[in-house]
Curated annotation (Swiss-Prot):
<feature type="binding site">
    <location>
        <position position="25"/>
    </location>
    <ligand>
        <name>Mg(2+)</name>
    </ligand>
</feature>
<dbReference type="GO" id="GO:0046872">
    <property type="term" value="F:metal ion binding"/>
</dbReference>
<keyword id="KW-0442">Lipid degradation</keyword>
<feature type="disulfide bond">
    <location>
        <begin position="47"/>
        <end position="192"/>
    </location>
</feature>
<feature type="active site">
    <location>
        <position position="5"/>
    </location>
</feature>
<dbReference type="GO" id="GO:0090729">
    <property type="term" value="F:toxin activity"/>
</dbReference>
<keyword id="KW-0800">Toxin</keyword>
<comment type="function">
    <text>Dermonecrotic toxins cleave the phosphodiester linkage between the phosphate and headgroup of certain phospholipids (sphingolipid and lysolipid substrates), forming an alcohol (often choline) and a cyclic phosphate. This toxin acts on sphingomyelin (SM). It may also act on ceramide phosphoethanolamine (CPE), lysophosphatidylcholine (LPC) and lysophosphatidylethanolamine (LPE), but not on lysophosphatidylserine (LPS), and lysophosphatidylglycerol (LPG). It acts by transphosphatidylation, releasing exclusively cyclic phosphate products as second products.</text>
</comment>
<keyword id="KW-0204">Cytolysis</keyword>
<dbReference type="GO" id="GO:0016829">
    <property type="term" value="F:lyase activity"/>
</dbReference>
<dbReference type="InterPro" id="IPR017946">
    <property type="entry name" value="PLC-like_Pdiesterase_TIM-brl"/>
</dbReference>
<keyword id="KW-0456">Lyase</keyword>
<feature type="binding site">
    <location>
        <position position="85"/>
    </location>
    <ligand>
        <name>Mg(2+)</name>
    </ligand>
</feature>
<keyword id="KW-0354">Hemolysis</keyword>
<protein>
    <recommendedName>
        <fullName>Dermonecrotic toxin LhSicTox-alphaVI1i</fullName>
        <ecNumber>4.6.1.-</ecNumber>
    </recommendedName>
</protein>
<keyword id="KW-0443">Lipid metabolism</keyword>
<keyword id="KW-1061">Dermonecrotic toxin</keyword>
Length: 275
């Protein structure tokens, strides 16, 4: 999965898909009352990027629905996964559950079209801090209680906090998410800084272990060709980048070509790939 990073303006959906992305990452800014409001990252962000592009969240979800609905004039068949990076800086911990419900309501209405011929992309909820696990609980509860349980098949989960994997595992348990139940484990840092592959390799080992909790692993934000190659060789399933074309064009040795290809829609993002 090539994940186009910080796609927060509607026009950027096409821009990043044209560059080779089959997935995008979008920032979702919440109000202090736990309402999803905008697609917005803000300052600081990655080096060499403009940090302040934004859209109203409902309008963005509707544009995203069109981009991922077969038969629509805006349809982009390549776009199969959307990572929602949830910005919770202004949300009280006590409001995390309601924030999850609010996000679920907006996705049902504006992306899934009330469950009728909505967008087909898989949705990965990326929660920045483990202690906000009740956002996931509220999100899942809304879909189950309002008759949209089937849509959970399209939803996965990630805690992006840079902490012990055991702490993240506990977060999923607290949220009611079983081991290997649509879980991605992320690792990374802003492209402004260098980072070793130590934690990424630990996450890959967890994914491949019989008693691990995750299905997939992605690495962010990777722009240098050497770093892209290193992350692929380390076993990452997804590469989050500001330059999808670099991932497409990075030199690949025969061993990489045997093991990896660009993901397609029929490839289940919740299933661990056995090499």
């Amino acid at each position: 999965w090539i994940m186009g990073h910080m796609v927060n303006a509607i026009y950027q959906i096409d821009e990043f898909v044209d560059l080779g992305a089959n997935a995008i990452e979008t920032d979702v800014e919440f109000s202090s009352s736990g309402k999803a409001k905008y697609t917005y990252h803000g300052v600081p962000c990655d080096c060499f990027r403009w940090c302040k592009k934004w859209e109203n969240i409902d309008g963005f979800l509707e544009a995203l629905r069109r981009a991922t609905t077969p038969g629509d004039s805006k349809y982009r068949k390549e776009l199969i996964l959307v990572v929602l990076d949830l910005k919770l800086d202004y949300v009280y911990l006590s409001d995390a559950y309601d924030a999850g419900k609010d996000l679920a309501q907006r996705l049902v209405k504006h992306y899934w079209n009330g469950g009728r011929n909505g967008g087909r992309a898989y949705i990965l909820l990326s929660v920045p801090v483990v202690e906000y696990y009740r956002l996931i609980t509220g999100f899942r509860a809304h879909l189950m209680n309002e008759g949209y349980k089937d849509l959970l098949a399209k939803v996965g989960y990630d805690f992006s906090e840079d902490t012990y994997l055991s702490t993240i595992h506990d977060g999923f348990r607290n949220a009611g998410v079983r081991d290997k139940d649509h879980i991605w484990q992320s690792d990374g840092i802003s492209n402004c800084f260098a980072r070793t592959l130590t934690r990424l390799k630990e996450a890959v080992s967890n994914r491949d272990s019989t008693d691990g909790y995750s299905n997939k692993v992605y690495y962010w934000t990777v722009d240098k060709e050497t770093s892209i190659t290193d992350a692929i060789n380390a076993g990452a399933d997804g590469i989050m980048t500001n330059h999808p074309d670099r991932v497409i064009n990075v030199p690949k040795d025969d061993e990489i070509k045997k093991k990896f290809r660009l993901a397609r829609y029929r490839d289940n993002p919740w299933k661990t790939f056995r090499k």
